[in-house]
Amino acid sequence: MRPKVGETYFGPMKRLEHLGIAVADLVEAERIFTDVLGVAPYKREEVEDEGVITSFFQTGDSKVELLESTTPDGPIARHIDKRGPGLHHVAFLVEDLEGEIARLEGEGYRVISGPKDGADDKRIAFLHPSDTAKVLVELCAEKRG
């Protein structure tokens, strides 16, 4: 079901989970965002499979994720080389990751990565930005049991 403009529709995307920001220097970015947001990061975590160290800030119901590459050829390093530091992805929380992937693939959207384990106790998948108005969209769900 595709809602019309002006209609209220509480669909499968539960909320904006976080904004992912690619940074060249995690320590400096943490200092800046601690000043700007008025809170310290609640978690720093390395995701070896992705070649990245993440740092999370809680901002109300949503989060900010800072991402620094641990390898010169990792996805975040390539992103910074091509586009510079800044917004990397927008993540939406879903209840059923595999179900949402199936629904979106059925509508012609391409998954370029996942489903797989990600940071902050989540299972994640990414949609191809060519299909999503040039925005890298992450779907994430809480890891189950």
Where are these regions (language model features)?
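Short secondary-structure junctions
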Residues: 38-46, 108-115
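Short loop/beta submotifs within extracellular cysteine-rich repeat domains
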Residues: 29, 39-40, 64, 72-75, ...
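Amphipathic alpha-helical segments
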Residues: 25-40, 104-107
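Regulatory and interaction patches adjacent to catalytic/ligand-binding sites
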Residues: 79-80
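N-terminal beta-strand motif that seeds the catalytic metal site of vicinal oxygen chelate
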Residues: 7-30, 85-94, 142-145
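Acidic (E/D-rich), amphipathic helical modules within compact regulatory domains
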Residues: 40-60
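Vicinal oxygen chelate
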Residues: 5-10, 55-58, 65, 92, ...
